[in-house]
Amino acid sequence: TSNTRSNTFGWLGQFPHFREWIGTRVMQQMAAHGYSITNKTWEDTVAISRDDFDDDILGIYSPIFQEMGRAAGCFPDELVFQALANADKTACYDGQNFFDPEHPVYEKVDGTGKMVPVSNLFTLKVGAAGATTDYTGPGWYLMDCTRVIKPLIYQNRRNPELVMQADPKTGVTFTDNQIVFGASLRSNVGYGFWQMAQMMKAPLNSD
């Protein structure tokens, strides 16, 4: 849930892990990562002739409003899965693409020490023996969604709301004899821990 124009996820770095407590606690300074997700406003608008709306005895316009409600309910899923489809070419909190062969991982959680590149993107080499041609078919994903922090972040700022403009003295109802129904919401999607997701560019089979 979001309550501002944008949210910055400064904790999206490598979390410390537990160690045996021997002697004094070891204080670890977390690496800071300024990863912001800015909310966007989305809308869907339908204009209907006021005469047609007044004469709608059979309720032919009711399915339109039902569809607007269905679309609003499905929209978060559309955003999330579009982000997933683009995740191998969109940067996450460490500056690399979310699915990338070279995520920088450091020895210490403050971002110091030896850096080791870690991959969460596997691309199968295809062709004859020794070939270096990348697999170009559809990829598939393996994700751990059991944790509190998810691989993908859906940030909701304002739930969908339906507004009707039907005042005959103002707006398009006055100028064009139309009644306008508009649905809007504010939200956005971004990337969480790449460590919880793996993209496989390879056939999904028993091999």
Language-model regions: role of each:
Residues 102-207:
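Sequence/fold signature of self-assembling virion shell proteins
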Residues 51, 56-59, 63, 70-134, ...:
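Alpha-helical scaffold segments that mediate packing/assembly in large oligomeric complexes
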Residues 18-19, 54-56, 186:
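Short active-site-adjacent helix-start/loop capping segments
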Residues 1, 81, 88, 171-174:
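Short glycine-rich, low-complexity/disordered patches
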